[in-house]
Amino acid sequence: MGGLEPCSRLLLLPLLLAVSGLRPVQAQAQSDCSCSTVSPGVLAGIVMGDLVLTVLIALAVYFLGRLVPRGRGAAEAATRKQRITETESPYQELQGQRSDVYSDLNTQRPYYK
């Protein structure tokens, strides 16, 4: 085992655990239940299958993520910023104080006192 890589050791561990205990796993508290017993080999197979499936999903996400184009570069960001400054603002510019707009409101004020 000294020459194996750490990844190989991880994959070998469930296999060794399955081989070491070949008798079925039984519940000690409930010996008369109608449950089916699961052997250590089946448990190791489930764990190994789960690990393999997880690695496959991670690899698929990684490779599919590499197919998507990267974010915009600095040149495109500069053009976008320039395009934003060139567009006209949809908001009206602020003007000085205009008293004629609200002058009719002052005539109604005495009614609200």
From Swiss-Prot:
Signal peptide: 1-21
Mutagenesis / variant outcome for changing residue 23 to C: Found in patients with early-onset Alzheimer disease; uncertain significance
Result of changing residue 47 to A: Found in patients with early-onset Alzheimer disease; uncertain significance
Keyword Calcium set for record: yes
Cytoplasmic membrane side: 62-113
Main localization, broad class: membrane
Tissue: Expressed at low levels in the early development of the hematopoietic system and in the promonocytic stage and at high levels in mature monocytes. Expressed in hematological cells and tissues such as peripheral blood leukocytes and spleen. Also found in bone marrow, lymph nodes, placenta, lung and liver. Expressed at lower levels in different parts of the brain especially in the basal ganglia and corpus callosum.
Residue ranges constituting the ITAM domain according to the UniProt record: 80-108
Polar residues composition bias: residue spans: 87-113
Keywords: Calcium, Cell membrane, Disulfide bond, Immunity, Membrane, Metal-binding, Phosphoprotein, Signal, Transmembrane, Transmembrane helix
Stated family: Belongs to the TYROBP family.
Record's disease association: Polycystic lipomembranous osteodysplasia with sclerosing leukoencephalopathy 1: A recessively inherited disease characterized by presenile dementia along with large-scale destruction of cancellous bones. Initial symptoms, starting in the twenties, are pain and swelling resulting from cysts in the wrists and ankles. Extremity bone fractures could occur with minor trauma. At around 30 years of age, patients gradually develop neuropsychiatric symptoms, including epileptic seizures, agnosia, apraxia, speech disorder, memory disturbance, euphoria, and loss of social inhibitions.
Protein name (Swiss-Prot/TrEMBL): TYRO protein tyrosine kinase-binding protein
Protein source organism: Homo sapiens
